Amino acid sequence: MIIAPERHGSDRIIAFSDAVVAIAITILLLPLADLEMPADGKVTTLFTENAAKFGGLTLSWVIIALFWFGHHRLFDSINIVDRPLMWLDFAWLFAIALMPLPTNIVTENDSTSQVVGFYVGWMALISLLMTLMLWHARRAPGIMDPEVVDSQAGREGWYRSLLITGVFLIVFVIALLMPQGATWFLLLQLAVDPIAARLARR
């Protein structure tokens, strides 16, 4: 007897994924609740003394939000979810749920190559898992409609995912070599959309 591969609709996994991301993005900001007012009682001093913490938490919050947008873009074009895609999504959610750990490490310690490398490397892992999900969805029969895969928007999404992962990997290498200010190179992500659009038109 041939057993058909297990496949499910995407609604439940989308709802579950949204819940995990919402919890992770909330936990990320909890360290701010432990901040104490400085001796001079000024809010401006509170912000200046904790500028690195605010900056790191804000950056991580924005990046998780962008990953969530990418996740929604992917699953909006998916008809069904098979077991490999489900496990890839669970791995992605595990990495998202642990994002507060590298964020806390980078905001509480000096910017050494190990500290910044771990932080950027963790984001590269999340992006790579997203790219693997998209790669599997594009090639596995029935998960995405062929016309969606072959459309300009579909090709643009594929190139965007590859480029985003590539930028994270490049910044990861930079972080290992020159950790001070390495995260500024994440602004290279601003060039991803126009490049992906141009590649998709070829």
Label the predicted regions.
Residues 1-202:
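Multi-pass alpha-helical transmembrane bundle typical of ion/small-solute transporters
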